[in-house]
Amino acid sequence: MWYFRALHRRRAHWLAALLPPGPARVLDAGCGTGGFIRVLRAAQPAWSVTGLDLSPLACGLARERTRAEIAEGSITALPFAEGTFDAVTTGDVLYHVEDTLAALREFQRCVRPGGVVVVNEPAYRWLWSYHDDAVESKHRFTAPGLGSRFRAAGLKVVFSSYANMLPLPLVVARRKLFPPAQPTSDVQLYPAPIEALFAGMAALEHAWTTRGWSLPAGSSVFVAGVRR
C-alpha cells in the first residue's frame, strides 16, 4: 500500500539522518502489528527496535511477526525508564489520544539527552471527514501547531514539513465533494494504476524533503526533534 510505504520511508530516513552511525535503541510507539519494526530492522540491522501498542491483539501479532520486544501500554504513560532510548517515533498514532502534550512529554522523557523524536500525523482540522470518524480521530494538526507542542514538551524542532502535498487536491475532492454513503477509511489498497500514481507522487516528495526542504501543504504533517 503506497501510503504506508511512504510513511515508513519518511520516518526511517529521518531517524537515520538524525541518529549517529552505529547501534541505537529505537521505540516504535503505537507499533500496530510490527510493519515499521520490520522496515527498520531491514534498513538498520545494528539498531535494537522495541515496539509498544495499546492493543493486546496487535502486540501479540507484532511479537509473532518480528520476534522483537513488544510492550503493551499507552503512549501517554510509557512503561520505560527515563532515557531508555536513542529515539522514539510514532506514525499516525498521536491523533488518537486526548492529551497529545502528555504523549510528547513521555517521548521526551524516554529518550536520552540529545535523543531523537520523529512524529507523523494527519493534517488540517478543515480536512476532517468521514475518514476521521471511521478511524476514531481526535485531532488533526498543523505544522506550526505540532511544532509548538514539541517545544512545550522540551523538544527542539530540527525539521518540520507537510507530506502528501501532491495528492492533496484528490484527497480534498474525495472527502469533501464525493464522500461515501458510510464512514470508511481512505487508507486502503487501490487498483494498481492508482497505487503507482500515488507512489510516484510520494517518491517526488521524498526526494524534495530529504534535501531538507519543507512542503508548504499536505494531508499529513511531519516533525522531527531532539531532546534538549
PLM feature segments, named:
Residues M1-A81, A87, G91, L104, ...:
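Conserved N-terminal segment of class I S-adenosyl-L-methionine
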Residues R63, E98, R112:
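Short conserved AdoMet
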Residues D92-H96:
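Short catalytic micro-motifs in class I SAM-dependent methyltransferases
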Residues L101-V116:
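A short glycine-rich, Lys/Arg-flanked "PGG" loop and its adjoining helix->strand segment in the class I
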Residues V117-H139, G145-R149:
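Short, glycine-/aromatic-enriched active-site segment of Class I SAM-dependent methyltransferases
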Residues P167-R228:
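A C-terminal cap/extension of S-adenosyl-L-methionine-dependent methyltransferases
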